[in-house]
């Protein structure tokens, strides 16, 4: 009674089961017209009544709501009666459709309905749809959409097309319930409909709105904006409802098709450029859009909605979701798909937890990695068994188990007498399992035919035991044939007295009379899959013993079906196993390189080569992705070679590290292995299978001539040539094949490099066995051997470009060196490359090679002509003579290895040899390192390490003795005095060294095959001698340099010589300047044999120490100057000392070094006092310190226009403030405003109360964060204070500022703003700072604010002088602390003042004292308040007192009043 129910929470309540959706929507719309609105209880009663009404016959279409209301009982709960009343009124207002014409009258009775004749067509009645109506006077019920509302509406209309009655009824009901604005309706449209439907609806709505605005709408104001904008106002209820009716009416003009056309499903690919996607959309719209339909809005809508996610993010970020198409294209023109092919992210695996796994109960692994099945959460709901899941319940599985056939045999024990025998199919029916399932569906287990397995490789043959009862049982192989009516057995199974009858047999060869006989004796046949024998009452006998056939008469008793397994083609597995790692395991996107066109000749050759590769099984047809171009190349003999350009695939491939360091050194073959044989493999790379997943990276296309058709696609089945990992993979596979052979023949040696194999054996018999075993292993693995290229001793053995003789090696092709001075760059480069190939056997030093290498340098054009100088031409002569002696010995295992190292100015030459041999084993050359200095100790240690590495790798031995060309004295001196890292290496190998010294040429002339003696290398001799202690009788040389100048000082009890000079303009190097200063200093000290050199350059210090021990000059930009040092230091005794610069120590070394540094400083032009004031506007005292007199400083201040305008008195008034006892004791802070160029700056100022030093920063705000930032900058500038004192502004009393002060251990107090006693110092500092800023901006209006503030702080802190102490604020801020006040101190002769005082903060009216002031300052005095402490007392709490007259002393005539104020 009068109860008001709440609105339903769900936007569309569910209809009762059996009620059509459009009927339920009519009931809902009528319910929502109730005032107040319906409750959930009303809907519950409505559903309950409709369920009852659905069972009555009155439920027809259209519904008679009056008849339905008569079924409603009186007093039915809820408001169902009101809902039916609204429906009855609405139904009466809707005009009824015209009734169909009555059927034509007939005099005859209607005939009986014929079931063959269909009834006449009756047009279905369209469901009635109620219009959207708002009750008069109803309050606005607008509520924005929520996601659950949109989802519920979309679920209701998911099966309806836009504009259909069900769609419109649902939308009307939602609009009536939520009363949406224009923006809400637009959101609903985008959520429900596709971009095409939304675009078409938008066009229709625009046209309807234009018509409505033209004819006028109640409540529409043209001056307030368009209708769509005014409808967004929730208060405009009537105007909003007009917009809702127009929005719903726009659906009536939509096309009837609910499906979008084909061009609406065009989507942008993940890697498709955006402009290409828009171009496809544009073409599709031109071809498929109806005439008259505007294309631009649809194109813009689809260009955003159908783009991929990355382009949609770009468009959203730039606000171009519905912008002009040009803006959208420009926004996405720089977008490229992310390159995911080169990125390999490896995330470390987290350690497993210590807790046990909840599946198996064991620790040490994650539950996701557990192999045990997951336990069920509870008992099975079907059988209540907690050990299995519901999906595994036995009740859900079929009760008939299916027998599993065995692979080897099938043994069925079936009864001999079957009540219902089944006739087998005629015609030799062999049945496979799928056919069997189709023939025998749903049979019980006793009627399933036994499956007889057959071997497809041997035809349907089976072993059977035949017992003819006239002889012993015999086992034969019989052919199973369901096409034979009778069983045929050979006559050999029967005895001679077996009765046989003549018969005629019709078979494939025709009718025969005498080939087969008929026996009537019973025959027993036992089959392997049956325990009970088959009994035949008669059978055919083959008189020629050719056939044994078990026919249909025997198989009929078995009731079996022959099962021939599907012929699975065995996979083609090459003998060599496929490699496990290929280098493409991360599977990047395969390359797509287009095939370039070929001329007819090349195309024909390519097709022939592809045909041969296809026949050989190296390639196969392919239809997948990926492509790399191919082309043929003609060889010198006229044949063609197949080339596959795999550069794109190689760029994606990871290099596999090869286990082979390179080709073996054939000199390591011992002379005892005299019997040799070479094996050459044909098409070696084509024997390694290529896994299927890598075929896209090795695919290619053979084009059609003139592009008459699509090309033919192929892919490699084996590793192709041109793939960068093919040699490494083949080398590993071949090593795996040869490893068992190596183990079987330990006395022999097998050399393998790529596809070349060399067999070495001590005897001919062993070589034959080794050769046969190797050949058999290679052939068994599918590696073809080229017989015509096999070489064997006795005879010449050519292997890897070298000729192997019994005791020596020579190169197959030794280059010929023409002697001429003019060379083309490619010619000389090719010649040096060939010489480098044969350099291991060429008896020459590094010098002629280095001379020709230098000729190749400093050339940038490959077409250059090179002109050799006479020394380089002589190097060609030496090389041609050395190449004529090119030969190497083979290893003699009974002799030790020896080494010889020759250090020269051009590099290092190393020789490995054995005694009493005609030729060395190998020659090794190494250039100098690319450094400015190469100590010979470092070169010798590097050569020893290289020698040991090579001999161990090639011969498996170390050199017993190493000869070098360094004298014993030089070697010992280097070991004793040098701190180079090579010293431990030389000490470790010193027991193997043999110093040749001055007898260098004797051993090396034997190697070089010459009689000319070799000159000793002068660079190995020490240039000068280092003294371990300072030389007292020698002068001292100091030198230094900068990027622009160099200087030196020569001192011997006084300065003998000093000089500074600038560097040449092109060079601005500090190292060059330091070296130049040292050279000039050494030139001035040329006459002294001993010298003390002091350097603050570590570079020069280490360079001179290395030069003293012997070094080679390397490549350096300072090489011309470095070459002068040995001349100036030759035969001198030098003491070297490194000085640390800028130490300010009082010793003479630091003083003279600082004096040398001072020579490098360019004098700065001193500013005149007038210029300084015009720049900084400093005070009079600061000008006097800069050299001006008092009168000149006063005149400068009076003549300054900015000072007269902004500060006529030229000083600030004095204030009174409690000061700190020492720097950074107490600070005061404040924020003052400064307006300049319409910008209000907040100057955060901090002042030290002891020194008056100021720190200021300009900000735009007064927040706590700005205050904290300014305080931190002040601390970085002045130091950390103990106390800070500010006003009680919001920035200073904020919690953030207080927390920051607490974290820095700073005590914060507040004072009264603008109080001269408590805040006078910071206020006066604000005035000084702002006065200077006004002066600067008066002179320079365009001066930046930060620059002006920096100049002002420099002027206040560093230039202006305090009058009371005659120091600047910065000097006072960094002055030493006050001495502690002793308990007893002697009276000084200085005039002192005595004061009565009161302690601040106490209300006592009694004066204390008098006490003598320790220090006086502006505003306060330091008074000892106790025997151990003093305190600053302001003037207002002080009274001057007369000094007590000392005993016996005269009275001070000036002191007349003993009680007066200061």
UniProtKB/Swiss-Prot annotation:
It comes from the Viruses. Residues 1031-1165 form the RNase H type-1 domain. InterPro entries: Aspartic_peptidase_AS, D_retro_matrix, DNA/RNA_pol_sf, Gag_p24_C, Integrase_C_dom_sf_retrovir, Integrase_C_retrovir, Integrase_cat-core, Integrase_Zn-bd_dom_N. A motif (PTAP/PSAP motif) lies at residues 124-127. Mg(2+) 2 binds at residues 1040, 1074, 1096, 1157. GO terms for biological process: DNA integration; DNA recombination; establishment of integrated proviral latency; proteolysis; symbiont entry into host cell; symbiont-mediated suppression of host gene expression; viral genome integration into host DNA; viral translational frameshifting. Residues 1393-1443 bind DNA. The modification Phosphoserine is found at residue 105. GO terms for molecular function: aspartic-type endopeptidase activity; DNA binding; DNA-directed DNA polymerase activity; RNA stem-loop binding; RNA-directed DNA polymerase activity; RNA-DNA hybrid ribonuclease activity; structural molecule activity; zinc ion binding. Mg(2+) 3 binds at residues 1230, 1287. Residues 1219-1388 form the Integrase catalytic domain. Residues 93-142 are annotated as: Disordered. Disulfide bonds: none annotated. It catalyses: Endonucleolytic cleavage to 5'-phosphomonoester; DNA(n) + a 2'-deoxyribonucleoside 5'-triphosphate = DNA(n+1) + diphosphate. The active site is at residue 481. PANTHER family: ENDOGENOUS RETROVIRUS GROUP K MEMBER POL PROTEIN (PTHR41694), RNA-DIRECTED DNA POLYMERASE-RELATED (PTHR41694:SF3). Reverse transcriptase/ribonuclease H: The reverse transcriptase is an error-prone enzyme that lacks a proof-reading function. High mutations rate is a direct consequence of this characteristic. RT also displays frequent template switching leading to high recombination rate. Recombination mostly occurs between homologous regions of the two copackaged RNA genomes. If these two RNA molecules derive from different viral strains, reverse transcription will give rise to highly recombinated proviral DNAs. This is Gag-Pro-Pol polyprotein. It comes from Human T-cell leukemia virus 1 (isolate Caribbea HS-35 subtype A) (HTLV-1).
């Amino acid at each position: 009674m009068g109860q008001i129910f709440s609105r339903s929470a769900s936007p569309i309540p569910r209809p009762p089961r059996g009620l059509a959706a459009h009927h339920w929507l009519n009931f809902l719309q009528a319910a929502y017209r109730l005032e107040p609105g319906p409750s959930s209880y009303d809907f519950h009663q409505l559903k309950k009544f409709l369920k009852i009404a659905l069972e009555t016959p009155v439920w027809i279409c259209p519904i008679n709501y009056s008849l339905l209301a008569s079924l409603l009982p009186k007093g039915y709960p809820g408001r169902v009666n009101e809902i039916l009343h609204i429906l009855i009124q609405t139904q009466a207002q809707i005009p009824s459709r015209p009734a169909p014409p009555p059927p034509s009258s007939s005099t005859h009775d209607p005939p009986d309905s014929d079931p063959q004749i269909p009834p006449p067509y009756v047009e279905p009645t369209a469901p009635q749809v109620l219009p959207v109506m708002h009750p008069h006077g109803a309050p606005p019920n607008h509520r924005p959409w929520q996601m659950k509302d949109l989802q519920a509406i979309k679920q209701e209309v998911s099966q309806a097309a836009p504009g259909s009655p069900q769609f419109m009824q649902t939308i009307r009901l939602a609009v009536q319930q939520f009363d949406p604005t224009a923006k809400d309706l637009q959101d609903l449209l985008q959520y429900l409909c596709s971009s095409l439907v939304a675009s078409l609806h938008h066009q229709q709505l625009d046209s309807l709105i234009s018509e409505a605005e033209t004819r006028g709408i109640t409540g529409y104001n043209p001056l307030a904006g368009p209708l769509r904008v005014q409808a967004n106002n929730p208060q405009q209820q009537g105007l909003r409802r007009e917009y809702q009716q127009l929005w719903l009416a726009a659906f009536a003009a939509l096309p009837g098709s609910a499906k979008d056309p084909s061009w609406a499903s065009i989507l942008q690919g993940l890697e498709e450029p955006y402009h290409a996607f828009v171009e496809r959309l544009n073409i599709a719209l031109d071809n498929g859009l109806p005439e008259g339909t505007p294309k631009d809005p649809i194109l813009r809508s689809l260009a955003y909605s159908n783009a991929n996610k990355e382009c949609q993010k770009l468009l959203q970020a730039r606000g171009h979701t519905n912008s002009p198409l040009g803006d959208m294209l420009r926004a996405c023109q720089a977008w490229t798909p992310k390159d995911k092919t080169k990125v390999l992210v490896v995330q470390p695996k987290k350690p497993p937890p210590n807790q046990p796994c909840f599946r198996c109960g064991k620790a040490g692994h994650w539950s996701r990695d557990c192999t045990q099945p997951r336990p069920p959460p509870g008992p099975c709901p079907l059988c209540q068994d907690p050990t299995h899941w519901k999906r595994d319940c036995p009740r859900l599985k079929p009760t008939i188990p299916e027998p599993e056939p065995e692979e080897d045999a099938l043994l069925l024990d079936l009864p001999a007498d079957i009540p219902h025998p089944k006739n087998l199919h005629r015609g030799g029916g062999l049945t496979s399992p799928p056919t069997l399932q189709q023939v025998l569906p749903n049979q019980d287990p006793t009627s399933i035919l036994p499956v007889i397995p057959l071997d497809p490789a041997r035809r349907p043959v089976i072993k059977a035991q035949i017992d003819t009862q006239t002889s012993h049982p015999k086992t034969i192989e019989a052919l199973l044939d369901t096409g034979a009516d009778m069983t045929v057995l050979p006559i050999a199974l029967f005895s001679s007295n077996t009765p046989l009858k003549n018969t005629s047999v019709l078979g494939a060869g025709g009718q025969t009379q005498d080939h087969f006989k008929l026996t009537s004796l019973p025959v027993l046949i036992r089959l392997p899959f049956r325990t009970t024998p088959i009994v035949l009452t008669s059978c055919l006998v083959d008189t020629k013993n050719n056939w044994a056939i078990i026919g249909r008469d025997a198989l009929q008793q078995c009731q079996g079906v022959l099962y021939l397994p599907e012929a699975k083609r065995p996979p083609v597995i090459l003998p060599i196993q496929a490699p496990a790692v290929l280098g493409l395991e991360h599977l990047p996107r395969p390359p797509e390189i287009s095939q370039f066109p070929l001329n007819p000749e090349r195309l024909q050759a390519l097709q022939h080569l592809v045909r041969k590769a296809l026949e050989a099984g190296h390639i196969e047809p392919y239809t997948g992705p990926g492509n790399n171009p191919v082309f043929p190349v003609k060889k010198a003999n006229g044949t063609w070679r197949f080339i596959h350009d795999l550069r794109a695939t190689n760029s994606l491939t990871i290099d596999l590290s090869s286990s082979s360091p390179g080709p073996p050194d054939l000199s390591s073959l011992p002379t005892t292995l005299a019997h040799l044989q070479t094996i050459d493999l044909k098409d070696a790379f084509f024997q390694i299978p290529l896994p299927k997943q890598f075929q896209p990276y090795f695919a290619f296309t053979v084009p059609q001539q003139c592009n008459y058709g699509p090309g033919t696609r192929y892919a490699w089945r084996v590793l192709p040539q041109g793939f960068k990992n093919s040699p490494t993979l083949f080398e590993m596979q071949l090593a795996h094949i040869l490893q068992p052979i190596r183990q079987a023949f330990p006395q022999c040696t097998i050399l393998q490099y790529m596809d070349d194999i060399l067999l070495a054996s001590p005897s001919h018999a062993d070589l034959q066995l080794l050769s046969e075993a190797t050949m058999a292993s290679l052939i068994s693995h599918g590696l073809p051997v080229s017989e015509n290229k096999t070489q064997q001793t006795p005879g010449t053995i050519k292997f890897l470009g070298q000729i192997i003789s019994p005791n020596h090696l020579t190169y197959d092709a030794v280059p010929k060196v023409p002697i001429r001075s003019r060379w083309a760059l490619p010619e000389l480069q090719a010649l040096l490359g060939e010489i480098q190939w044969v350099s291991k056997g060429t008896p020459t030093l590094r010098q002629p090679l280095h001379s020709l290498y230098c000729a190749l340098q400093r050339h940038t054009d490959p077409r250059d002509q090179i002109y050799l100088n006479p020394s380089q031409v002589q190097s060609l002569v030496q090389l041609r003579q050395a190449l004529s002696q090119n030969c190497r010995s083979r290893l003699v295992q009974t002799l030790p290895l020896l080494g010889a190292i020759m250090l020269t100015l051009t590099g290092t030459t190393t020789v490995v040899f054995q005694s009493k041999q005609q030729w060395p084993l190998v020659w090794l050359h190494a250039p100098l390192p690319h450094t400015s200095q190469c100590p010979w100790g470092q070169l010798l240690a590097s050569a020893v390490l290289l020698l040991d590495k090579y001999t161990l790798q090639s011969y498996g031995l170390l050199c017993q003795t190493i000869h070098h060309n360094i004298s014993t004295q030089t070697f010992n001196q280097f070991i004793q005095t040098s701190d180079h890292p090579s010293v431990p290496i030389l000490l470790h190998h010193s027991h193997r060294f043999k110093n040749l010294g001055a007898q260098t040429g004797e051993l090396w002339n034997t190697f070089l095959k010459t009689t000319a003696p070799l000159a000793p290398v002068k660079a190995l001799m020490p240039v000068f001698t280092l003294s371990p202690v300072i030389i007292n009788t020698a002068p001292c040389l100091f030198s230094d340099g900068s990027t622009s100048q160099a200087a030196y000082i020569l001192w011997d009890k006084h300065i003998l010589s000093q000089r500074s000079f600038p560097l040449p303009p092109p060079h601005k190097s500090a190292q060059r300047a330091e070296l130049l200063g040292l050279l000039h200093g050494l030139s001035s000290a040329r006459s002294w044999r001993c010298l003390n050199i002091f350097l603050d350059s570590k570079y020069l210090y280490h360079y001179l120490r290395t030069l003293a021990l012997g070094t080679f000059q390397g490549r350096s930009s300072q090489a011309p100057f470095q070459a002068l040092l040995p001349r100036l230091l030759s035969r001198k005794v030098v003491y070297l000392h490194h000085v640390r610069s800028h130490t300010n120590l009082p010793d003479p070394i630091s003083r003279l070094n600082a004096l040398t540094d001072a020579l490098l400083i360019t004098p700065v032009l001193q500013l005149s006092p007038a210029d300084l004031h015009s720049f900084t506007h400093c005070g009079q005292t600061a000008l006097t310190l800069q050299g001006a007199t008092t009168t000149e400083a006063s005149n400068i201040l009076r003549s300054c226009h900015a000072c007269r305008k902004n500060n006529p008195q030229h000083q600030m008034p004095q204030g009174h403030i409690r000061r700190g006892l020492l720097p950074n004791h107490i600070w005061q802070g404040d924020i003052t405003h400064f307006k300049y160029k319409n910008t209000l700056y907040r100057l955060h100022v901090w002042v030290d109360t002891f020194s008056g030093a100021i720190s200021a920063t300009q900000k735009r705000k007064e927040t706590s964060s700005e205050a904290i930032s300014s305080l931190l900058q002040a601390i970085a500038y002045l130091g950390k204070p103990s106390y800070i004192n500010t006003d009680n502004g919001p920035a200073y009393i904020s919690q953030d500022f207080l927390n920051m002060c607490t974290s820095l251990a700073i005590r914060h107090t507040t004072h009264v703003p603008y109080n001269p006693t408590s805040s006078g110092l910071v206020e006066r500092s604000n005035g000084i700072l702002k006065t200077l800023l006004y002066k600067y901006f008066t002179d320079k209006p365009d001066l930046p604010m930060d620059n002006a503030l920096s100049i002002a702080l420099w002027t206040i802190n560093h230039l202006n002088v305090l009058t009371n102490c005659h120091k600047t604020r910065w000097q006072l801020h960094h002055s030493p602390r006050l001495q502690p006040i002793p308990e007893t101190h002697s009276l000084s002769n200085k005039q002192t003042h005595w004061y009565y005082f009161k302690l601040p903060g106490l209300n006592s009216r009694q004066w204390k004292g008098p006490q003598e002031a320790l220090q006086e300052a502006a505003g306060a005095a330091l008074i000892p308040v106790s025997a151990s402490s003093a305190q600053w007392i302001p003037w207002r709490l002080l009274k001057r007192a007369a000094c007590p007259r000392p005993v016996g002393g005269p009275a001070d005539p000036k002191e007349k009043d003993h009680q007066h104020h200061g």
